[in-house]
Amino acid sequence: EQKTFNVIPSARFVYNFSKQEEFNANYWGRNNQPNFYQLQPIADNSNLQNIVTGNPNLEPEFIHSVNASYKKTDWDKGQILTLEASYNQTQNRIVTTKVLIPNTVNQITSYTNTDGFYNVNGKYNFTRPFFERKFTFEYSGEGWLNNNITFINNEKNTANNTVWRQELEFRLDLEDIVNLEIETSYSQNKTKYSQEGLDDRLTNRFEYGINGRNYFFEDLTLGYDFSKTINTGFDNSFVNNPAILRLFMEYSFLKHNMGTLRLDGFDLFDQNSGITRDVFDNVIVDRRVNRLGRYFMLSFIFRVRNFGG
């Protein structure tokens, strides 16, 4: 029988410098109890290559979380600046332990408590319109730092994962002429292990794209959405640098433009796929997902309007 007692505090601070400038910070705690299977001291032999045994001495894990944000707005200029940061730390984190059985391909998995888990996240965004809000510039960025711990053959392994991303965006809005958005971003994902024999990993991703609408003769619209992704550092069998293009033509007619005929072409280069990287325990998983490919769609939209008299 185990008995636990936790005091879970929380705090909030808000300060308004003015109607256009504010700062707030929060702290809270929470705990997670080990589940039945993690506590059960009976071996699960359903998979002889991975025998799982619980640990009845596990303690609950406790998470401390802090976040803060700052926002400043200039209503006259339409300018916005936002800053955000967060920090999470876990005490007595419940982690898996894996021990290889000598001269076999089998392993024994169990659970233990350990400290050293934390993650830090920060992001910012700056937006500024020009020329009576016809042109808008936006710059944003974000970064993560995650520190994870596993045990392999009773040896502690620390996986330090760092991710950061920068993005630039330009928007053009000319009424009844064009709405256009151009964006580009660069991100990097780096994982470093403390245990020898595990290779460090570094991947990079560069993305750029353009999307918008052009308006002709008050009833004809041409829309487009193009993006290109360039990946490096992934496993060679996963490397894919898709260029994705979508086009549509839209014609509005009838009184008050109540009817719209639209033709869409999706993924015209037939390259739609995605690559992601997940880091957990002593494993790095690269995933490639092939999504719905090139296709076309013709649609008719009729808008019913009820004008009260």
Label every model-predicted segment.
Residues 1-309:
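Exposed, low-structure sequence patches enriched in small/polar residues
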